[in-house]
Amino acid sequence: MTPHINAPEGAFADVVLMPGDPLRAKYIAETFLQDVVEVTNVRNMLGFTGTYKGRKISIMGHGMGIPSCSIYAKELITEYGVKKIIRVGSCGTVRMDVKVRDVIIGLGACTDSKVNRIRFKDNDFAAIADFDMAQAAVQAAKAKGKAVRVGNLFSADLFYTPDVEMFDVMEKYGILGVEMEAAGIYGVAAEYGAKALTICTVSDHIRTHEQTTAEERQLTFNDMIEIALDSVLIGDAQ
């Protein structure tokens, strides 16, 4: 047990899928897993363990922003022996060639947060996903006939940013999606010897203001979850 997770030892699988919303974690567990057990509920940050096609997998929410997700990721790795974390969530985009409902695999994550500089002695840390996990996710998407984009994300500290000019910089540098957690999770995984990947569905376009409906979000979200889950099985077979 930790101050933030009240699961007993051995309650989590070695692979954990992490959406931001704890209710989305519950949805994933109840929709895609079998033999589901709720293993933690401190602060209503729900966590579950079950099986997917016979493979033990856990699902747990991580909240919003790098500070929140970093706490949960660290404790899962160091206190519960988790080896792989897959963040599954939504993101915005600033690029006109990236569309709402696209699925993005975050090979790397830029950030305006200083957390990785703090842990890396004020030097720049290249926050990247585990290559094998990213490759497995691409293979899972291809097997489903789903197109995915692969590249850089931007993990922002501010949801309501006053610096709209930064969107132009992101577009120039080819940032595929804007979210709030990937760089932190990649940093934590690197620090504690684990592996991590982020998969996002584009829910809104920052330039055009196009947004998905609740029903559309659920449909595309399901594609992303199936890609993430199947990627675990592919990774096991490699």
From Swiss-Prot:
<dbReference type="InterPro" id="IPR018016">
    <property type="entry name" value="Nucleoside_phosphorylase_CS"/>
</dbReference>
<comment type="similarity">
    <text>Belongs to the PNP/UDP phosphorylase family.</text>
</comment>
<dbReference type="GO" id="GO:0005829">
    <property type="term" value="C:cytosol"/>
</dbReference>
<dbReference type="Pfam" id="PF01048">
    <property type="entry name" value="PNP_UDP_1"/>
</dbReference>
<keyword id="KW-0808">Transferase</keyword>
<feature type="binding site" description="in other chain">
    <location>
        <begin position="87"/>
        <end position="90"/>
    </location>
    <ligand>
        <name>phosphate</name>
    </ligand>
</feature>
<feature type="binding site" description="in other chain">
    <location>
        <begin position="179"/>
        <end position="181"/>
    </location>
    <ligand>
        <name>a purine D-ribonucleoside</name>
    </ligand>
</feature>
<dbReference type="InterPro" id="IPR035994">
    <property type="entry name" value="Nucleoside_phosphorylase_sf"/>
</dbReference>
<dbReference type="InterPro" id="IPR000845">
    <property type="entry name" value="Nucleoside_phosphorylase_d"/>
</dbReference>
<feature type="binding site" description="in other chain">
    <location>
        <begin position="203"/>
        <end position="204"/>
    </location>
    <ligand>
        <name>a purine D-ribonucleoside</name>
    </ligand>
</feature>
<dbReference type="InterPro" id="IPR004402">
    <property type="entry name" value="DeoD-type"/>
</dbReference>
<keyword id="KW-0328">Glycosyltransferase</keyword>
<dbReference type="GO" id="GO:0006152">
    <property type="term" value="P:purine nucleoside catabolic process"/>
</dbReference>
<feature type="binding site">
    <location>
        <position position="43"/>
    </location>
    <ligand>
        <name>phosphate</name>
    </ligand>
</feature>
<feature type="active site" description="Proton donor">
    <location>
        <position position="204"/>
    </location>
</feature>
<feature type="binding site" description="in other chain">
    <location>
        <position position="24"/>
    </location>
    <ligand>
        <name>phosphate</name>
    </ligand>
</feature>
<protein>
    <recommendedName>
        <fullName>Purine nucleoside phosphorylase DeoD-type</fullName>
        <ecNumber>2.4.2.1</ecNumber>
    </recommendedName>
</protein>
<feature type="binding site" description="in other chain">
    <location>
        <position position="20"/>
    </location>
    <ligand>
        <name>phosphate</name>
    </ligand>
</feature>
<dbReference type="GO" id="GO:0004731">
    <property type="term" value="F:purine-nucleoside phosphorylase activity"/>
</dbReference>
<comment type="function">
    <text>Catalyzes the reversible phosphorolytic breakdown of the N-glycosidic bond in the beta-(deoxy)ribonucleoside molecules, with the formation of the corresponding free purine bases and pentose-1-phosphate.</text>
</comment>
<feature type="site" description="Important for catalytic activity">
    <location>
        <position position="217"/>
    </location>
</feature>
<comment type="subunit">
    <text>Homohexamer; trimer of homodimers.</text>
</comment>
<feature type="binding site">
    <location>
        <position position="4"/>
    </location>
    <ligand>
        <name>a purine D-ribonucleoside</name>
    </ligand>
</feature>
